[in-house]
Amino acid sequence: MTTEKNLIVFKTTTMVAIALCLISLLAACSGNSGSGSKTSADKTSVSSDDKSLLGAGSTFVYPLFSKLFYVYDQKTGVRINYQSIGSGGGILQLKNKTVDFGDSDAPLSDEQTKGMGAEVLHVPMCSGAVVISYNIPGITDTLKLTPDVLADIYLGKVTKWNDAKIKNLNSTVQLPAMNIAVAHRSDGSGTTNIFTDYLSKISPDWKSKVGKGTAVNWPAGLGGKGNEGVAGLIKQTPGGIGYIELAYAIQNKMLFAQIQNKSGNFVTPTIASTSAAGNVQMPADSKVSLTNTDAPDGYPISGFTWALLYKEQSYSSRSKNRAENLVNLLWWNIHEGQNYCAGLYYAPLSKEATAIAENILKSATYKGTPILTAGANSK
């Protein structure tokens, strides 16, 4: 009998202890202000900390943003957590209001614009080159490619590295009878938009069969996530070819081709040739394509990248201070931040593009009142 009573007491005590532990855990979780979990209140605001901004989008510009946001944090104490998930992902997160800003190498389409729920501003950050990188064992030469040959490779019409179309352009290179392994993006990508926009301009066949966009139905090849993923596919695949941003190619010590431009010149992607392509008349909303440039020394597969933010910043319980921190960050990016572009193989904005970016940022409001005042934030 005593044993039975002891068992009952033990079981009861154990159950009470477990219940108390569960209550303590639930209390701790509900009171936890860390980033590990979200409550229903969190869903209406990206963060309660106005000194910590959230961004997401383009992998194309990630090497530059990493530098800019580190420097800006050191200067101002404002932290920026940027998720390099691709332009499509950045647009979606901005639409869902889970980030303060997105970034895309493709301007919003008319359909995307309608779905955003309110006006979105496009602020140009810089321009960059999409390079055609390759991995042919034993070959260290810089290859030359024409627009039609590049299109045929991605259409699956040219499948061997020693195809006559490639050999005729590179007569001094001993190209092997190796299969071409095409790599492309698997995620929604502004880099893809730049590349397919170019192919659509130079190849009627590509335009009619595939077209342009941040995501397309690829006729051939394997997909990788982000510029990092495509670079990885090229490096690990003998015979590989793919399109990546210039900074990724240089940082990974990868070969990339000279591309023939509209003027008939074979152009190496550099800061100078990207800047030449970007020397265009920019409209007031900054949405412009740089591909297939008319500039004789311009690299033909170049493009801008844009920070995206809602014009009216009073939404989802955002504070005025948070809105000011975001606009101040982007203002710094288009001014002092431009000094870091060339060192990371991006082309800084021209004076004209900077002036347009300034006007766009000056149109941002909080409860209808401009966030930037005359002469403000010009340092």
Q: Which sequence ranges carry the predicted segments?
A:
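C-terminal motif of bacterial Sec signal peptides marking the signal peptidase cleavage site
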Residues: 24-28
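Bacterial N-terminal signal peptides that target proteins for export
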Residues: 2-16
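Flexible loop/hinge segments at secondary-structure junctions
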Residues: 29-379
